[in-house]
């Protein structure tokens, strides 16, 4: 079992390059098979979720050529509407994007119910509602979603709740439906806009992504394209809070500052100095930070994927902070681990009350999910002494070379696999 071992207590200082957005890359890779021509995608993050999805694409007949770690060519001319089995995609929730892509291209999709992080029920009912409205027949049999249609037809769909996944998935299918589809109460996240831009670069006709209403005029075929994925605003935000929690001075490069507005607002609120450039943001924390209140919301509100990172930082702030999690249930599991490090926290339903302490104590903790795992690493970096983070497979799902990037800005962190390596690390840093 791989673990991170961390010697904390020093500020993080320097510059770190942010990679492509995982949450944009996953649906874009799925959508790439909707044309029979070759698609080139670059600025891909080299993370486990991406590699699992590429293997699944290959398994249904797509030709995959890795140009380099961050660039891939995909040709979907050999794609068949074969079943996508649980073993192929059990580790990633984004497997549901195959439904929209295959329904649009092949008029049939059989996909195992998705896996991924355990952070609540995260239903896919809005996806299925959208597909049915477009004319697909949907059955759930033996842990699989079976979707079939003779022809998808454009329609007017109002989502009952704002869902990033449903917005993207239904938009993909509607891109090749007959007629015009209007989607209302849609998600506006940057990766929703990115997948719309990608589909448009292949010849789709999608307007309004990033606004309240998306209008899609279906086309009969899509064509080849070359496309670069947007930077990952969640990876950027993670390093920004790492700077804040460690009283550091970090510049995150290759970002779109507009995508980070909610994160920047909270960093300024708790006392950080934040400077924005064209494609970079600098975060400086010179003194002890102060408490605040935060509520997770759909974009452009504060992102749920940044909730654990601010939670860890607030545990070290002066005063009492309140976090309200309005997107997912079970997203406070990391606070039990943080309490093992001396944090004073109380959870009441979807609200966490955090009493700031002067310092945390090193401990052995376990990552309950992707973002929580990264947040616990931040806690370790902000804490004097040796902290060990178990179950880092979650972190590797969504962060490329996480420990290397932290080391580049002064973090003392290594990946280990045995007690012997742990002892070797302790000797080295003692």
Model-identified regions with their sequence ranges:
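Short, structured segments at the rim of ligand-binding sites
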Residues: 1-430
């Amino acid at each position: 079992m791989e673990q991170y071992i961390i010697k904390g207590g020093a500020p993080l200082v320097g510059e770190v390059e942010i990679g492509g957005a995982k949450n944009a890359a996953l649906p874009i890779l799925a959508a790439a098979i909707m044309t029979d021509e070759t698609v080139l995608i670059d600025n891909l993050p080299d993370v486990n979720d991406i590699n699992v999805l590429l293997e699944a694409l290959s398994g249904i007949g797509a030709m995959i050529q890795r140009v380099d770690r961050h660039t891939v060519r995909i040709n979907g001319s050999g794609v068949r509407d074969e079943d996508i089995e649980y073993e192929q995609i059990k580790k990633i929730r984004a497997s549901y994007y195959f439904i929209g892509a295959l329904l649009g291209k092949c008029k049939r999709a059989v996909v195992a119910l998705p896996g991924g992080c355990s952070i609540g029920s995260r239903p896919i009912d809005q996806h299925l509602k959208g597909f049915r409205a477009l004319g697909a027949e949907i059955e759930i049999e033996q842990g699989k979603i079976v979707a079939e249609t003779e022809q998808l037809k454009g329609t007017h769909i109002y989502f009952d709740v704002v869902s990033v996944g449903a917005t993207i998935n239904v938009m993909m299918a509607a891109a090749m439906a007959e007629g015009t589809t209007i989607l209302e109460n849609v998600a506006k996240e940057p990766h929703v806009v990115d997948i719309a831009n990608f589909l448009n670069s292949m010849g789709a006709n999608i307007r309004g992504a990033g606004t309240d209403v998306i209008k899609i005029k279906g086309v009969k075929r899509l064509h080849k394209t070359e496309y670069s994925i947007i930077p990952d605003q969640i990876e950027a935000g993670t390093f920004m809070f790492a700077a804040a929690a460690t009283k550091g001075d970090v510049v995150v490069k290759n970002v779109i500052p507009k995508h980070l507005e909610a994160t920047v607002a909270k960093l300024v609120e708790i006392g950080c100095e934040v400077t924005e450039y064209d494609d970079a943001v600098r975060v400086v924390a010179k003194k002890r930070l102060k408490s605040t209140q935060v509520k997770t919301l759909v974009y452009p509100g504060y992102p749920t994927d940044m909730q654990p990172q601010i939670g860890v930082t607030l545990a070290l702030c002066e005063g009492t902070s309140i976090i309200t999690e309005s997107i997912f249930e079970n997203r406070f599991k990391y606070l039990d681990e943080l309490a093992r490090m001396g944090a004073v926290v109380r959870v009441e339903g979807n609200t966490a009350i955090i009493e700031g302490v002067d310092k945390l104590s090193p401990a052995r903790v376990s990552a309950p999910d992707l973002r929580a795992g990264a947040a616990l690493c931040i806690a370790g970096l902000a804490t004097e002494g040796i902290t060990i983070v178990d179950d880092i497979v979650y972190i590797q799902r969504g962060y490329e070379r996480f420990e290397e990037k932290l080391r580049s800005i002064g973090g003392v962190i290594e990946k280990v696999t045995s007690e012997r390596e742990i002892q070797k690390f302790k000797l080295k840093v003692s």
